[in-house]
From Swiss-Prot:
Comp. bias (Low complexity): 40-51
Family statement: Belongs to the MG067/MG068/MG395 family.
Organism this protein belongs to: Mycoplasma pneumoniae (strain ATCC 29342 / M129 / Subtype 1)
Sequence segments annotated as region (Disordered): 31-51
Protein name (Swiss-Prot/TrEMBL): Uncharacterized lipoprotein MPN_588
Keyword Signal: yes
Record localization: Cell membrane
Length: 531
């Protein structure tokens, strides 16, 4: 029997009995346009054939039966997931890489933005400049570590401006293009593109709208070396690798409010996300931390942007940066984007990020339950070490990942989601429980082989973000960790960055009297505000 673990995309990791490959999607790249030389971007025909995405070796529709291209209504169970979540696109000279991200934190003047979550096309600015304290608004997006591996910015924060071996990034791997995408339809879409130049041929009632930010993102946090590995050993299983990881990272996107595209990102993408974030509990009530055994009797809702066939009625529209837009970011230690893609290239792609949720029309089921063996599958107990769908990643010694040229072993705990095999590009999607708490982040698919034949390929995997201390409710729980707020067992957690940068999440920590959120206040942190 063989266990294969697919993250479904550009990153493939081999082990003796398991394979870990990325649930982000990748395709060969083209030569991007240079805004500095060409001025405003107009569609042109590429001189070479447009390459097709190569997100997976196996057919993309392997058992795919999920709902796509449906914007949730206000009462829909997926509405908050939709508002929070975006398609992420990182491009370098070699590859075009897609993943999914969601609003995790922010820093900026909310009052000046009039944040109410409503959709307001922002071709003309909706910002009350008289109220602005600064011309910047910073957004922090959560995704998988294996997606954040695609971000290679030589003006990033330390230690991320070089690889893990302290070597400069190669020219072919440096990030040159970044965009946020969201699926829009109907009047919302028509209003959006009606004022855009060069979009007259793209009148459609459905589209993935991608907006190129003015800056290349930076790395706020990676869940690398986040625990003492000895605290999470399983049956004395050891590893030769010196580091550990959870498949979780946070990237920083700095928005220049004088830049037209950044204004659009803020008003049309970020404002609804902030509204959803606050509706779900605004930091302190949003992120679940509960004993592992309490995950079992839950239903989990998943929404992301896997790369699949776009269909005849779905366009892929790129709102690119232009030379005429404001790119004055020298005072903010940002790396401006000077490259973009041709709309003609975008139009020819037959596989794009497609809005997908885990509703299944074939049996009218919504959400996902944790994995449970069927009566005829008792043999799985000898292949997958799990407790009613909860796994300790320390039991899989060869689940490893290379991040910025250093290999790490996966640690912490995760969920096995039955009948939830989202394809590549969905990596980083948030998992929200029936209790409206965000508990984990989706990262891949488990494939199980019996006698050389594929027996199961429908088990989705997610990484739990927080586990409580003193957990006695689960047979596989040995220690706690908290990737967001920290605890005594967690060496590396996001709240340290939030405190150094005085973000919204840290402001909520300061307001709280609950000790589970205030661990960072008991620790010394190192200010990391340099570039």
């Amino acid at each position: 029997m063989r266990l294969q673990f697919k993250l479904l995309g550009f990153l493939t990791l081999l082990g003796t009995s398991t394979i870990l490959s990325a649930c982000a999607a990748t395709q060969p790249n083209f030569e991007p346009n240079n805004i500095e030389e060409s001025g405003p971007i107009t569609p042109t025909t590429p001189t070479t054939d447009v390459p097709k995405p190569t997100a997976e070796v196996v057919p993309v529709n392997r058992g795919f039966h999920f709902q796509t291209n449906k914007v949730p209504s206000e009462s829909d169970v997926f509405k908050h997931n939709y508002d929070l979540t975006f398609s992420l696109n990182f491009t370098n000279k070699s590859n075009d890489i897609y993943g999914t991200g969601w609003l995790f934190d922010w820093k900026g003047d909310e009052k000046a933005l009039g944040i109410d979550g409503s959709f307001v096309p922002s071709i003309t600015s909706n910002i009350d400049n008289s109220l602005l304290k600064d011309d910047q608004f910073t957004v922090y997006l959560a995704t998988n570590l294996h997606v954040a591996d695609a971000l290679r910015n030589d003006q990033d924060y330390e230690p991320y401006k070089k690889d893990q071996n302290k070597q400069d990034f190669t020219e072919n791997t440096k990030t040159e293009f970044f965009s946020l995408g969201k699926y829009l339809e109907g009047e919302q879409l028509k209003q959006y593109i009606s004022k855009e130049e060069n979009q007259s041929a793209n009148q459609t009632d459905k589209a993935l709208v991608s907006i190129q930010a003015s800056n290349i993102p930076k790395t706020a946090y990676t869940a690398t070396d986040f625990v003492d590995m000895n605290s999470y050993s399983y049956n004395n299983i050891t590893t030769s690798l010196p580091g550990n990881y959870a498949d979780f990272a946070v990237i920083e996107v700095n928005l220049n409010l004088k830049n037209q595209r950044d204004q659009q990102i803020l008003h049309d993408f970020v404002k609804p996300a902030i509204k959803a974030y606050k509706a779900l509990g605004d930091t302190l009530e949003l992120f679940s931390a509960k004993p592992l055994n309490q995950f079992i009797e839950q239903n989990y809702y998943l929404l992301g942007y896997p790369v699949i066939n776009k269909g005849n009625n779905t366009a892929n529209l790129l709102l690119a940066q232009q030379k005429s837009f404001d790119h004055n970011n020298s005072d903010h230690n940002q790396k401006s984007q000077w490259f973009t893609k041709d709309q003609s290239y975008i139009n020819k792609l037959d596989r794009i990020p497609v809005l997908t949720n885990n509703y299944r029309a074939y049996n009218e089921s919504t959400g996902s339950q944790l994995f449970a063996n069927q009566q005829n599958e008792s043999w799985l107990n000898g292949v997958v070490i799990q407790d009613k769908g909860v796994v300790n990643f320390a039991s899989f010694s060869n689940f490893t990942l290379k991040y910025h040229e250093k290999r790490f072993q996966q640690y912490g705990y995760g969920l096995m989601l039955n009948d939830t095999n989202f394809p590549g590009g969905s990596s980083g999607s948030p998992l929200i429980g029936k209790d409206n708490k965000l508990n984990s982040i989706y990262f891949g698919v488990l494939e199980i082989y019996q006698s050389g034949s594929l027996a199961r390929n429908d088990i989705g995997m997610s990484q739990i973000l927080r586990t409580p201390q003193n957990d006695k409710g689960s047979s596989i729980s040995k220690g706690s960790y908290d990737l967001i707020f920290g605890d005594k067992n967690t060496k590396n957690y996001y709240a340290k960055f939030a405190k150094d940068h005085q973000t919204h999440l840290y402001q909520k920590i300061k307001e709280s009297k609950d000790e589970q959120f205030r661990f960072v206040e008991t620790q010394e942190t190192t200010n990391n505000l340099g570039n």
